[in-house]
């Protein structure tokens, strides 16, 4: 008789399958973590799967820091903590960690420990192709999940094109801002000047499709604590810009109805995007501090809020001789309103909101 072939596996990544294994994922993970190997464990992922016959199976991806040589076929046997039963796995070297991880992930009932290790075979894809990977990334539920898929399955692209991948993923997975919840109902503002109310009614009082193209913006000047910010932010979905301009995808959204620009120095706005913003211009480009230039969809008006004074008043700023041409343009593209008092009734606000201020 020919000699019996000895069991021997030499691998850095190991794929284990435990048929008819009644252990929970957590019990299996604890026991596998306790197995002594000649190389440190880096990552373990375990999936529990019910086969057609109703029997539970466990699938395990084990990644190590370096290659190990396994000659003990019983090394990965698991033991039931409640009865006299041993569970012996099928043991294979994992040629493509990404393929095995995808297989283990397929039913979703998983547990993992450590950090998944990208290997060179993942770059060649095994059964993965670039189109498969990018299709999977597009179907991901979040930016983070999409980038992780590409990191695991297309590591060359991830390393060499990370900036482009991140920029594109941010655009694809950009979510609408969480709606801002007004502290006070719009009905609280009972002293809104007629020109402000007319401006708001003409824009927010009609269907979006019926709104005029490049609707004029409005510049509201008034003392602090007159309620102008709360009023402006209570009208609908908006971008809120204060202090400085940040058009990154984290803070500025295209799919809103208007912009609120609050306490932005007019000198600063003149150097940046005065005409783009106040003129509700469409499809304009801005440079980002981090990342490539971004094209802003635009086409929405602004409510600009400012305080009186030579450094903050937009009206005083435009009266300067060097701003004569800008003043003429701004008067054609916006409405000015100077508040004479609070936009709310002090007594009514006090009785309904206690010590709160608008």
UniProtKB/Swiss-Prot annotation:
Motif (RCR-3): 103-106
Record note on what altering residue 144 to D does: In strain: Infectious clone pBCT028
Region (Binding to RBR1): 143-153
Keywords from the named record: ATP-binding, Covalent protein-DNA linkage, DNA replication, DNA-binding, Endonuclease, Helicase, Host nucleus, Host-virus interaction, Hydrolase, Metal-binding, Multifunctional enzyme, Nuclease, Nucleotide-binding, Nucleotidyltransferase, Transferase
Region (Oligomerization): 156-176
A GO biological process held by the record: DNA replication
Motif residue range(s): RCR-1: 15-18
EC number: 2.7.7.-, 3.1.21.-
Classification via Gene3D superfamilies: 3.40.1310.20
Superkingdom of origin: Viruses
Entry's family note: Belongs to the geminiviridae Rep protein family.
Domain remark from Swiss-Prot or TrEMBL: There are 3 rolling circle replication (RCR) motifs. RCR-2 is probably involved in metal coordination. RCR-3 is required for phosphodiester bond cleavage for initiation of RCR.
Protein name stated in the entry: Replication-associated protein
Source organism (scientific name): Beet curly top virus (strain California/Logan) (BCTV)
Organism lineage string: Viruses, Monodnaviria, Shotokuvirae, Cressdnaviricota, Repensiviricetes
